[in-house]
Swiss-Prot record:
Localization of this protein: Cytoplasm
Designated name of the protein: Imidazole glycerol phosphate synthase subunit HisF
Gene Ontology CC annotations of this record: cytoplasm
Subunit structure: Heterodimer of HisH and HisF.
Family the entry assigns: Belongs to the HisA/HisF family.
Function: IGPS catalyzes the conversion of PRFAR and glutamine to IGP, AICAR and glutamate. The HisF subunit catalyzes the cyclization activity that produces IGP and AICAR from PRFAR using the ammonia provided by the HisH subunit.
Keywords, in A-Z order: Amino-acid biosynthesis, Cytoplasm, Histidine biosynthesis, Lyase
A Pfam cross-reference name: His_biosynth
Catalyzed reaction equations: 5-[(5-phospho-1-deoxy-D-ribulos-1-ylimino)methylamino]-1-(5-phospho-beta-D-ribosyl)imidazole-4-carboxamide + L-glutamine = D-erythro-1-(imidazol-4-yl)glycerol 3-phosphate + 5-amino-1-(5-phospho-beta-D-ribosyl)imidazole-4-carboxamide + L-glutamate + H(+)
Organism: Elusimicrobium minutum (strain Pei191)
Lineage start: Bacteria, Pseudomonadati, Elusimicrobiota, Elusimicrobia, Elusimicrobiales
Length: 250
C-alpha cells in the first residue's frame, strides 16, 4: 500500500497566504515561504501553492515565489494559478517547482494537458477540479468557483487522465472551508473511475476527517489549508494519529 500524503495548501493572493470560507471572505494567514518552510519541518509530504487571483485577473504565474520556496524547502511543491502556456510551465519548473496545477486553463483548452505531459511528463501535470454538487450532480466550475461550466466532474476527471494528467486535485466547493469533513462519497466514486492518484480537498476540520478521507474516500492524498495555517491541527501529530488507525503515512 502506497503511503498516504498530507499536503498543506497555501492560497496566495497579492503575495500573502490567505484562506477563505467557500472561496470568499479572506483572512491573512501569513508569509507563504515561511509557512512552507514550517510545514516542511513538521513533516508535510508536499505543498501546493495556488494563486487564487491569477486566472480571474489574468496575471502571470508565481515564478518568483517558486524560486523563494525552492531555496527554503526540500519537499516537492506544486504551483497553480494562471498557468496557460508551456512557457509558464517551463519557467516554474526552472524556478524549482516540481509540478504545475491546471484548472481553468485545462477546461478551456484540454489539449494543454497533453502538451505538458509530452514536454515535461505526466508527473508534472496536476489537474485541479473545483466542483459543486447540485441535486445529486457534481459539476465543474471555472475561475475560482465563479463560473459553472455544467461539465460533469467524473466525466472531466476521466478525460483529464486520458489526456495525460498525472493526478487529480478535487476540491468540493460545498465542503470548502466549512470543516465538516471531505466529500468522501464523491471521492470514492472518483477513485473507481480514474487510475491516477486523487488528492482530496475541501472540508478538513479534524484528525478524524483525515482518517475518513483515506478509509472511506479512498483518497491518495489529503489537502487542507486553514486547519494547518491557524494551528488547529499539527501535521506531525496528525500523522501519529493516522498511524494509530493503521493508515500508512511517510
Amino acid at each position: 500500500m502506497l503511503a498516504k500524503r498530507i499536503i498543506p495548501c497555501l492560497d496566495v493572493k497579492d503575495g500573502k497566504t490567505v484562506k477563505g470560507v467557500n472561496f470568499i471572505n479572506f483572512r491573512d494567514a501569513g508569509d507563504p515561504v515561511a509557512l512552507a518552510a514550517e510545514y516542511s519541518r513538521k513533516g508535510a509530504d508536499e505543498i501546493v501553492f495556488l494563486d487564487i487571483t491569477a486566472s480571474h485577473e489574468k496575471r502571470k504565474t508565481l515564478t518568483d515565489l517558486a524560486r523563494r520556496v525552492a531555496a527554503e524547502v526540500n519537499i516537492p511543491f506544486t504551483i497553480g494559478g494562471g498557468v496557460r502556456e508551456l512557457e509558464d510551465v517551463s519557467a516554474l519548473l526552472a524556478a524549482g517547482a516540481d509540478k504545475v496545477s491546471l484548472n481553468s486553463s485545462a477546461l478551456k483548452n484540454p489539449n494543454f494537458i497533453t502538451e505538458i505531459a509530452k514536454n515535461f511528463g505526466s508527473q508534472v501535470c496536476v489537474c485541479a477540479i473545483d466542483a459543486k454538487e447540485n441535486n445529486g450532480k457534481w459539476t465543474c466550475y471555472l475561475n475560482g468557483g465563479r463560473i459553472d461550466t455544467g461539465k460533469d466532474l467524473f466525466v472531466w476527471a476521466k478525460e483529464a487522465e486520458n489526456l495525460g494528467a498525472g493526478e487529480i486535485l478535487f476540491t468540493s466547493m460545498n465542503h470548502d472551508g466549512v470543516k465538516t469533513g471531505f466529500a468522501n462519497e464523491a471521492l470514492a466514486k472518483l477513485g473507481q473511475i480514474v487510475n491516477i492518484p486523487v488528492i482530496a480537498s475541501g472540508g478538513a476540520g479534524s484528525k478524524e476527517h483525515f482518517k475518513d478521507v483515506f478509509l472511506l474516500g479512498h483518497a491518495d492524498a489529503a489537502l487542507a489549508a486553514s486547519v494547518f495555517h491557524f494551528g488547529e491541527i499539527d501535521i506531525s501529530e496528525l500523522k501519529t494519529y493516522l498511524r494509530g488507525n493503521r493508515i500508512v503515512v511517510r
